[in-house]
């Protein structure tokens, strides 16, 4: 409980509040503890962070709130309907989606939960249309029997008391279920030794269903009773913000210690209220404070971690990354001609786009190319080295800010702006990755997501810091040549993408590339061959950050000014899932994912824009675990195999993990 005491001391020392505000934070923290405990339960069993935890209860809560607020349904009937909906929805998600990946690498299941999160956000955004309402925050949900009391300076009512009673009741019930019942004890055993539990006849699949349903119900209870106190502001970042608070509690509780996780969530609620009370004009500051708490907790875990905790399990690697063709196949004349010819045709076709696209379409095309570059950075960090990053757009934002400083304030040449942006983003990426270097690559997902929310909400917002330029770019120059049109901006973006792809191709075949790709599969074996694991991970973060920084400058050029809305945390998740759809282990996957997912988003209304990435990542990973690029490589191997047979050569093996 030392971490809980540390957060409480931080709040009392830096963000003191009156008693009433402190009690209000305690109430909200109790509700938040339910979501954090649900997150801890699924992590305990599956050893993955369930990024859909914040959204599992959102859609049922929106349904219940709509029934009560718009259809005048009885409060208890609406609550019961939402509760049943939460059970059915979570059970369906676990049986139809999660269970299909029970034997998949943990990285794949993590990507699936991100896709589920986005899919559930779309559902929650569409439910209010049943009543012709948008947004749902106009609905009012109050406990039927109303009374108030006052603890200066806050007036509490029956909704607050009900929230306290329900929260404590749920925590006690989960504690008794987890420690006293046969199912709860079996969940503990399966979480500690899943394979051994299966061998002993424990129905792990059924336990997983029960655990996920419990987590979904806890998520629903959190959001429904918060709606009565704070309302239900529904947007794509709503679940993310709640999730980061739960992640902070999870980190403070060492990811598996449920009592500490619950207590941490309570004191984090008090801390958030303290930050909001001391700086009411700047609510986004709470995100930065939460990010700092996450970083501190991960650093402490790294210092205290045992050797076993520090070893990355092989299941974090991808199932079957891309392998080059055998030398005999590469020597075939058709293969020698096809590869450069195909690349040249694709590049030439892309270069013709400015001839038939309008200005608005060219802006979108330039942004799409920039996002493909961000996808390439994800390939290096996640696809190759196994460090899950959910904050790549925040590194791109660093590049965008430094590019704006170089171009607007200092009037530098674009070449120097690219170098400054890439170098700065590389340094920031290394700093963000430092707390997780000796831990499982899954922990990088927590720190990068926390940084993404803090950066997009506070750290890199011009309204918060006056040194961030807000003006228009004007006419940038590259080696003295002016970039005066959207067509030239697109051509520059395309050129940068080609250079990045060529650099990654060379890097992949270098010693550094081979070392990075060996990290997820067997860290101990790599260390035995003289690989310095920490330095290899630092290299991955630096290279990835540099590439993302370049993409930030490209986005800056496309929009002609630094706009923090281009680098939101939700955009980081969309880019990550787009790359997963394309194929995390291949730079081709980054391009395909950006083209298919990001390209389709352009033509959809706002409430549907998360749908392609959400549905795409689930369907593609079920049918093609290596993404669209993996499908392309399978077709390549089939075609080359047919050619080899015609020439009487040995058949080509399918692309497998290297």
Residue ranges and their predicted role:
Residues 16, 28, 54-57, 77, ...:
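Transmembrane alpha-helices and adjacent helix-loop boundaries
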Residues 21-32, 36, 54:
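N-terminal transmembrane alpha-helices
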Residues 32-41, 61, 83-95, 371-377, ...:
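Central hydrophobic cores of alpha-helical transmembrane segments in multi-pass inner-membrane proteins
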Residues 38-46, 91-100, 249-253, 377-381, ...:
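C-terminal ends of transmembrane helices
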Residues 40-49, 220-237, 251, 549-564:
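Non-cytoplasmic
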Residues 48-51, 169, 193:
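Glycine-rich phosphate-binding loops of nucleotide-dependent enzymes
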Residues 96, 197-202, 207-282, 288-289, ...:
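Ordered, small/hydrophobic-rich secondary-structure cores
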Residues 177-185, 189-193, 507-513, 519:
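Transmembrane helix boundary and interhelical loop/hinge segments in multi-pass membrane proteins
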